[in-house]
Amino acid sequence: MSDIDEKNDTKESSFSSDVVLLSLLISGSTLGAIAGYNRYLKQVTKATDIPNYMFRKRWMYGKVTAVGDGDNFHLFHTPGGIFGGWGWLRKVPKLPKSDSNGLIVSRKKTSNFYSGLKNSYHKFTGSYRYSSEYFLDLKVPYKNLRNLPTVPIRLCAIDAPERAHFGNTSQPYGDEALIWLRNRLLGKYVWVKPLSVDQYNRCVSKVVCWNWLGWQNISLQMVRQGLAVVYEGKTSAEFDREEFLYRFYERRSKAKKRGLWRQRVIETPGEYKKKIKK
């Protein structure tokens, strides 16, 4: 074999090795990109699709597009936020604005002397902030946006008063809890820590959001406001190892007669559900 043939064989062998190496690099990069996308950037559109490794360990980021009750809402998952392309490469839904005054419940303004005196007293003592009137007057700037690929979220550790469903009457402070939650969350971005999936295929979660006071645990805030009680179920209760906090703030709200604890006779959501099932 001549020197020229040997050189050609060497070049062909080197070229083949380079092609194989390049193919492996491209394949590896592609597989790595797919794995990274699935793990960090793939949108979750229902609770049953949440990967097992996320429960109790990782957080989901997204926008609240609908609040249907005092202890649950719908989350439009936006993994990676702006770095995941949301808002410039991937579309984020815009919620329709509510009516000009933003009030959910219309209340007649009465000139009753006693009512005016009572409200003045509540405002003077600071208890007005936890009264039914205060919560009903909260403004909600957006309307719910339905029919989206969203994850239904159930707030962990709490039960809010039941609203009117299937012909059943609403509990006191059911509307107040709904309005407060809409005022606090609707149209905003939140962090959600998945804990479990309940019988209705909702993701029971710890939910936090940012405001000028810092990060706030929404479930805990509802207990502090007197708009929810600590979850009464013996099974499937999720506290994310913070049950003592919820119990402490429930006792405090009860002692200070905040929200639903202002009533003379209390019927908890758990007691109400048992009653209507009979």
Curated annotation (Swiss-Prot):
Residues passing through the membrane, by range: 15-37
Single annotated GO MF: endonuclease activity
Membrane topology: Single-pass membrane protein
Signal peptide: none
Enzyme class, spelled out: hydrolase
Active site positions: R154, E162, R202
Localization in the cell: Mitochondrion; Membrane
Enzyme Commission number(s): 3.1.-.-
Gene Ontology CC terms, in alphabetical order: membrane; mitochondrion
Domain TNase-like residues, every copy: 58-263
Keywords, comma-separated and alphabetical: Calcium, Endonuclease, Hydrolase, Membrane, Metal-binding, Mitochondrion, Nuclease, Transmembrane, Transmembrane helix
One Pfam family of this chain: SNase
Binding site for Ca(2+): D159
Keyword S-adenosyl-L-methionine: no
Highest taxon above the source species: Eukaryota
UniProt cross-references to PANTHER family, sorted A to Z: EBNA2 BINDING PROTEIN P100 (PTHR12302), SERINE_THREONINE-PROTEIN KINASE 31 (PTHR12302:SF3)
Family assignment from sequence similarity: Belongs to the LCL3 family.
Protein name: Probable endonuclease LCL3
Species assigned in the record: Vanderwaltozyma polyspora (strain ATCC 22028 / DSM 70294 / BCRC 21397 / CBS 2163 / NBRC 10782 / NRRL Y-8283 / UCD 57-17) (Kluyveromyces polysporus)
